[in-house]
Amino acid sequence: MNDVFSTAQHKLDALGLRCPEPVMMVRKTVRQMAQGETLLIIADDPATTRDIPSFCEFMDHTLIASETSQTPYQYLIKKGL
C-alpha cells in the first residue's frame, strides 16, 4: 500500500458494491467524521473512478490521492466543510 494511503484516519471497504452504493456509503461515513479527517476508500466498481472525484468536488471535500490503474481502486479524501 502506498504510504499516502496508510495515513488515513478512517477506512471504508466498498469492495463488491455497485453504483450507487459506494458513494452512498462514503457520504454516510464522511458525515460521522470531523472536518479535516481523512478517509481511505477501497472499491472495485469502475463507476467509482468517476463518482468519487465528482462527490468530492460537489461536497467540497479534497481528493488527496487516488490509485485507479488496477483494482482494488483506492481513494484518499479529506473532509471539507
From Swiss-Prot:
GO terms for biological process: tRNA wobble position uridine thiolation. It is found in: Cytoplasm. PROSITE patterns: UPF0033. GO terms for molecular function: sulfur carrier activity. It comes from the Bacteria. One of its GO terms (cellular component) is cytoplasm. InterPro entries: Sulphur_carrier_TusA (IPR022931), TusA-like (IPR001455), TusA-like_sf (IPR036868). CDD domains: SirA. The active site is at 19 (cysteine persulfide intermediate). Pfam families: TusA (PF01206). Keywords: Cytoplasm. Sulfur carrier protein which probably makes part of a sulfur-relay system. Belongs to the sulfur carrier protein TusA family. PANTHER family: SULFUR CARRIER PROTEIN TUSA, SULFUR CARRIER PROTEIN YEDF-RELATED. HAMAP family: Thiourid_synth_A. This is Sulfur carrier protein TusA. It comes from Shewanella sp. (strain MR-4).
